[in-house]
């Protein structure tokens, strides 16, 4: 086994299915045979626009597979382990790492962005980043552990949740639906989910949303002004005007959490900013998942999170850019598009 198939980003929309060498293992690393790899929204500019840190590059950070080889310093007992992988590789020695904040590492690497990822038959990863999975968890389900953990981290950024309160999740993509489920698992029964895609809203309702709202047909600020403001609001879509609207939807002393990344400037009206001040709103960001602990596996195993309906499209690795085009087309109502390998 000296070569493998991989999808290699060589430039904008240059996503080439080709043979490349199987990665050599460094000390502390293992070789994972990839079984499933999801497409994250952050992969889109990497593949469509060539927006990676260096070219050529292999993207893909939501994945699972089997350990098939180990490097120096790693127990051979890991061979055969079924696992997902935490993609963040913190340096371990900067000030933030020393304080137990690996997501804030200033010298981090990231599997699928700063180093080769999992849109390939094999990927080399640090053994410490393995997240073991139970035999009753499928590879496709396990590939969702990373986005599940993104949602968990986002919800936990809101602080200790108070029973009997209410929340809004703006955006009904993968992270939005997972955020809704995490809130429910933490005891928030009244979770409103807002989007413009009715098919995705219908799925959110099926999975337990208290109420779903189509923002194409409903004036969202007016709706909550009449029905009552909420305690927590989470923006997961990465849309600038939604992010600016969020303060209008929460009660005084409410909490806003921004999970979605946005490519355009976000502008707050003076009155909205005054609302933040006068209402003493808590405003925070949430950045990716975190490397340890990585609780998405337990949420999945326990049934707190259900992902089967979220994985809407599956492709062989050889499909290449077709999988991304499926994600781009609104008519497909795609949520998690995934490469699945034998």
Task: Identify the residue ranges that each predicted region occupies.
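NAD(P)H dinucleotide-binding glycine-rich loop of Rossmann-like/cofactor-binding domains
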Residues: 91-170
């Amino acid at each position: 086994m000296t070569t493998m198939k991989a999808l290699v980003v060589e430039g904008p929309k240059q996503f080439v299915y080709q043979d490349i060498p199987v990665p050599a293992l460094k000390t502390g690393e293992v070789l994972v045979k990839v079984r499933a790899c999801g497409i994250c929204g952050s992969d889109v500019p990497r593949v469509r626009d060539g927006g990676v840190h260096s070219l050529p590059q292999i993207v893909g950070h939501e994945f699972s597979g089997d350990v098939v080889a180990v490097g120096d310093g790693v127990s051979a007992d890991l061979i055969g382990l079924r696992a997902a992988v935490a993609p963040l590789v913190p340096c371990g020695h900067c000030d933030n790492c020393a304080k137990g904040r690996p997501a804030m590492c200033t010298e981090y690497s990231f599997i699928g962005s700063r180093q080769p990822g999992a849109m390939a038959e094999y990927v080399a990863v640090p053994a410490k980043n393995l997240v073991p999975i139970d035999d009753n968890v499928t590879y496709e389900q396990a590939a969702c552990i990373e986005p599940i953990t993104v949602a968990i981290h986002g919800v936990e950024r809101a602080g200790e949740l108070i029973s009997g309160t209410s929340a809004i999740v703006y955006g009904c993509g993968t992270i939005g639906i997972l955020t809704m489920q995490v809130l429910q698992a933490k005891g928030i029964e009244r979770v409103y989910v807002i989007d413009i895609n009715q098919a995705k809203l219908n799925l959110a309702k099926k999975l337990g949303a208290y109420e779903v709202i189509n923002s194409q047909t409903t004036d969202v600020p007016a709706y909550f002004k009449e029905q009552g403001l909420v305690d927590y609001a989470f923006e997961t879509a990465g849309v600038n005007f939604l992010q600016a609207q969020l303060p209008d939807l929460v009660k005084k002393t409410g909490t806003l959490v921004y999970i979605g990344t946005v490519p355009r400037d976000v502008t707050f009206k003076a009155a909205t900013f005054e609302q933040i001040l006068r209402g003493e709103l808590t405003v925070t960001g949430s950045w990716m998942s975190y490397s340890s602990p990585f609780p998405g596996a337990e949420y999945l195993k326990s049934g707190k999170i259900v992902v089967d309906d979220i994985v809407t499209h599956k492709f062989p690795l050889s499909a290449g850019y077709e999988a991304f085009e499926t994600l781009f087309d609104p008519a497909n109502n795609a949520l998690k598009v995934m490469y699945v390998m034998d």
